[in-house]
């Protein structure tokens, strides 16, 4: 998928919503626990309920890895289900990989060749040679952690150098000099919306993956105001506020309602910027 194709889908669905599949077996409705694969059953119901309102899904690998081989199987089957039933959806594997070159090459092969996801979150801490194996895959996107929504982001990401540049700004700026930088996206937390204007001066055209709207308290209005570009350039992720909106047999309908409400807000934002 290209960024143009992604933007076309955003315009068609009047949404830039990404639904995060942070599926915790301890939080899914009790009636699903009798299923052969409760995690997959929950995910299928959430996907079916929200696909109409979103353009992307982001399964978080840690929630599946915590279940061992059973969870890994659920992760793979979830991706297969999205790809088969909703082939227009952009799939982001939230795995936060990144290691020396040959190890990153194996990570890239796993996610882009075997699982066939569209994008993968990656840590840039080890530098260009740890990222280049991911960028070698045409049509696939590498989503670099830039400015995250957690409190600990202050520890390193907000450190300034002698010229006053934040570390996260340096990460973004230098990464734009790498080969195939057009395949980079960046994670910028919604709780850091005040920094989006400055980030857009560094990467006016790149897509930003923005978690933190919903349960974490980030403002969708602020994100759209300061982060949207001429091609939208945003994928706003919501996880808990959608998938755990209800814990009864009506959980999927409630999730659909939450996703629909966010989609309506996003449509207003897109119209305000004259993008649709």
Curated annotation (Swiss-Prot):
Active site residues of this protein: 96
Record CDD domains: OMP_decarboxylase_like
Taxonomic lineage of the native organism: Bacteria, Pseudomonadati, Bacteroidota, Bacteroidia, Bacteroidales
Name the record gives this protein: Orotidine 5'-phosphate decarboxylase
Transmembrane segments: none
Pfam families recorded: OMPdecase (PF00215)
The keyword Lyase belongs to this UniProt entry's keyword annotation: yes
Enzyme category, top tier: lyase
Pathway membership, UniProt: Pyrimidine metabolism; UMP biosynthesis via de novo pathway; UMP from orotate: step 2/2
Keywords for this protein: Decarboxylase, Lyase, Pyrimidine biosynthesis
Top-level lineage group: Bacteria
Reaction(s) catalysed by this chain's protein: orotidine 5'-phosphate + H(+) = UMP + CO2
UniProt-listed SMART domains: OMPdecase
GO biological process: 'de novo' pyrimidine nucleobase biosynthetic process; 'de novo' UMP biosynthetic process
Protein family per UniProt: Belongs to the OMP decarboxylase family. Type 2 subfamily.
Signal peptide limits: none
């Amino acid at each position: 998928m290209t960024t143009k194709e992604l933007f076309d889908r955003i315009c068609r669905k009047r949404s830039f919503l990404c639904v995060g599949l942070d599926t915790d077996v301890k939080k899914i409705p009790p009636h699903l626990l009798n299923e052969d694969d409760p995690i997959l059953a929950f995910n299928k119901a959430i996907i079916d309920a929200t696909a109409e309102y979103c353009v992307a899904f982001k399964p978080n690998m840690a929630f599946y890895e915590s279940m061992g081989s059973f969870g890994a199987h659920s992760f793979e089957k979830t991706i297969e289900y999205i790809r088969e039933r909703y082939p227009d959806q952009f799939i982001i594997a939230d795995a936060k990989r990144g290691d020396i070159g040959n190890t990153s090459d194996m990570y890239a092969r796993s996610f882009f060749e075997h699982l066939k996801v569209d994008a993968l979150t990656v840590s840039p801490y080890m530098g260009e040679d740890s990222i280049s194996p991911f960028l070698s895959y045409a049509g696939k996107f590498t989503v670099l952690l830039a400015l995250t929504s957690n409190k600990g982001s202050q520890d390193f990401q907000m450190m300034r150098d002698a010229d006053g540049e934040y570390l996260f700004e340096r990460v973004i700026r230098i990464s734009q000099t790498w080969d195939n930088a057009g395949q980079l996206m960046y994670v910028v937390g919604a709780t850091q919306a005040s920094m989006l204007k400055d980030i857009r001066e560094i990467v006016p055209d790149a897509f930003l993956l923005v978690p933190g709207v919903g349960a974490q308290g980030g403002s969708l209005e602020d994100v759209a105001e300061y982060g949207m570009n001429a091609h939208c350039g945003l994928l706003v992720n919501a996880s808990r506020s959608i998938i755990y909106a209800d814990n009864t047999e009506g959980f999927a309908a409630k999730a659909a309602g939450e996703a629909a409400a966010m989609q309506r807000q996003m449509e207003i934002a897109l119209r305000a910027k004259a993008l649709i």
